[in-house]
A protein has these predicted regions:
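Short, solvent-exposed amphipathic alpha-helical segments in soluble enzyme
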Residues: 17-20, 69-74, 144-147
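Glycine-rich, Lys/Arg-enriched anion-binding loops that position phosphate/diphosphate groups
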Residues: 31-140
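C-terminal accessory domains and tails appended to enzymatic cores
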Residues: 100-186
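Charged, low-complexity, helix/coiled-coil-prone segments
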Residues: 5-12, 36-52, 178-186
Length: 186
């Protein structure tokens, strides 16, 4: 699996696109107590199916999370831009980025697939999501199995990662409907 166009998860300093699925909704996502971003949630889904992630293409803030901070230090990574702040980034030259991407793809495809680690999380799974706003929490509490941790955080337990993955998607869509209720009024 190649993950293309990814960004850091919520809260990474200097990140210009930090979010996890629902940029307006999710404040923190954890599986079995471990901080997760879109890259690791999706990599665990690939891992559930026995498929490794060989390449990630994304910004410097994600590179810090995956490589420097050790979330997935083995993965081949191509940095698309240097994130400077929430509203700014320094993009790399298109020609350089194209060449680095070609080289990374060739390196992964010419390598030994069987030596690539498969990103897995052991079952059973506890999904914990903290929302940006209370109304989002209220909508999420309508989901079967959702338990309140506090006024903005839910937990749902799963035995199967595919069900967890679908649960993340369902939560994202359901709480997205809450956004207009919490939007600033004029």
């Amino acid at each position: 699996v190649f993950l293309v166009g990814y960004h850091s998860g919520v809260g990474e300093a200097s990140a210009n696109m930090d979010h996890s699925y629902g940029g307006r909704t999710f404040h923190d996502v954890r599986i079995n107590g471990k901080y997760m971003n879109e890259s690791t949630i999706n990599s665990a889904y690939a891992g559930y199916h026995g498929v490794p992630v060989g390449l990630v293409i994304g910004d410097s803030a994600l590179q810090k999370q995956l490589i420097t901070d050790g979330m997935m230090p083995w993965v081949e990574f191509v940095k698309t831009k240097d994130s400077l702040s929430m509203m700014s980034a320094k993009f790399r030259p298109k020609g350089v980025l194209r060449q680095e991407t070609i080289e990374a793809v060739i390196k992964v495809l010419d390598g030994d697939y069987t030596s690539l680690p498969v990103y897995k999380i052991d079952a059973p799974y506890t999904l914990r999501i903290e929302f940006n706003m209370r109304t989002m929490f209220d909508f999420a509490m309508l989901l079967p199995g959702a338990k309140a941790v506090d006024g903005r955080t839910i937990e749902i337990h799963f035995d199967d990662y595919e069900e967890l993955f679908n649960g993340v998607m369902a939560v994202c869509y359901i709480v997205g409907m809450a956004y207009p209720f919490d939007a600033p009024r004029r």
